[in-house]
Amino acid sequence: MDAIKKKMQMLKLDKENALDRAEQAEADKKAAEDRSKRLEDELVSLQKKLKATEDELDKYSEAPKDAQEKLELAEKKATDAEADVASLNRRIQLVEEELDRAQERLATALQKLEEAEKAADESERGMKVIESRAQKDEEKMEIQEIQLKEAKHIAEDADRKYEEVARKLVIIESDLERAEERAELSEGKCAELEEELKTVTNNLKSLEAQAEKYSQKEDKYEEEIKVLSDKLKEAETRAEFAERSVTKLEKSIDDLEDELYAQKLKYKAISEELDHALNDMTSI
């Protein structure tokens, strides 16, 4: 941009110099024309003097001596006049040559002036094109800066969501471990209850065999059986609840893994878009 401005200033300076040279050439031309006019006037005056001398020579040709002297004087004047005429002709020729050179300089100056004006016009058009491109580039950079800020915000949101999902996953994994421990504990208790049920069943069979002997204890045994049955149902209910909890947690883990995968894909896409925007800004 500074180089173009310097070039514009140089072209303007060349234009001003060309105008000055053109004005100087015009002044030289006018001065040469004035000198040529003066020399032509002097030539006409000398021609008039020569004619007067010739007339005077004719007038006094009748007087031999005077005529001879006057003739010699007239011839001398004529010779001087011819010399003056020749000198004037040479001066006129020099003035004409100087006038031709001045006209050539004027034509050269005018041509340079025209070329300088064309170059200045082209430079102005180039400046306008460059300014338009610079304005478009600035607008594009502003848009890319806005897009970059938005991409950074999106990336930051994605990072926060990713961290939140990771924390949730850690919590769920911990809950899953505890649920698995409770399920194992429930399974152990179920096994114990099954063993206890078998023992109770065996005892019940033994009691049934001795029912007649121990009929007075029947109510007590029935109550024990009911209590044991309730404990068995409770254990089975707890085992079913543990199984449903494990199933629900497994589904939650699957959903979170899907969400985590989707967030990773989104984060990857945002990172690629951000890299692309940074590459565009770097290339600019």
UniProtKB/Swiss-Prot annotation:
Biological role: Binds to actin filaments in muscle and non-muscle cells. Plays a central role, in association with the troponin complex, in the calcium dependent regulation of vertebrate striated muscle contraction. Smooth muscle contraction is regulated by interaction with caldesmon. In non-muscle cells is implicated in stabilizing cytoskeleton actin filaments.
Question: Which of the residues bear the PTM Phosphotyrosine?
Answer: Y261
InterPro entries per record: Tropomyosin (IPR000533)
Give a GO biological-process term. cardiac muscle contraction
Question: What protein is this chain from?
Answer: Tropomyosin alpha-1 chain
Q: How does it assemble?
A: Homodimer. Heterodimer of an alpha (TPM1, TPM3 or TPM4) and a beta (TPM2) chain. Interacts with HRG (via the HRR domain); the interaction contributes to the antiangiogenic properties of the histidine/proline-rich region (HRR) of HRG. Interacts (via N-terminus) with LMOD2 (via N-terminus) and TMOD1 (via N-terminus).
- Which SUPFAM superfamilies does the protein's record reference? Tropomyosin
Q: Which residues are annotated as modified residue N-acetylmethionine in the UniProt record?
A: M1
Transmembrane stretches, start-end = none
Subcellular localization is given as:
Cytoplasm, Cytoskeleton
Region described as Disordered: spans on this chain: 13-38, 53-82, 116-141
The record lists the lineage as: Eukaryota, Metazoa, Chordata, Craniata, Vertebrata
The record's similarity note reads: Belongs to the tropomyosin family.
Kindly list the positions at which Phosphoserine occurs in this protein.
S45, S174, S186, S206, S252, S271, S283
Please report what switches on or represses expression of this protein: Induced by hypoxia. This induction is reversed by exposure to normal levels of oxygen.
Provide ranges: composition bias, Basic and acidic residues: 53-80
The cellular component terms of Gene Ontology attached to this UniProt record, alphabetical and capped at eight, are: actin cytoskeleton; actin filament; cytoplasm
- Which residue windows are coiled coil? 1-284
Q: Tell me what gene encodes this.
A: TPM1
Q: Which Pfam families match?
A: Tropomyosin
The record's comment about this protein's domains reads: The molecule is in a coiled coil structure that is formed by 2 polypeptide chains. The sequence exhibits a prominent seven-residues periodicity.
| Organism of origin | Sus scrofa (Pig)
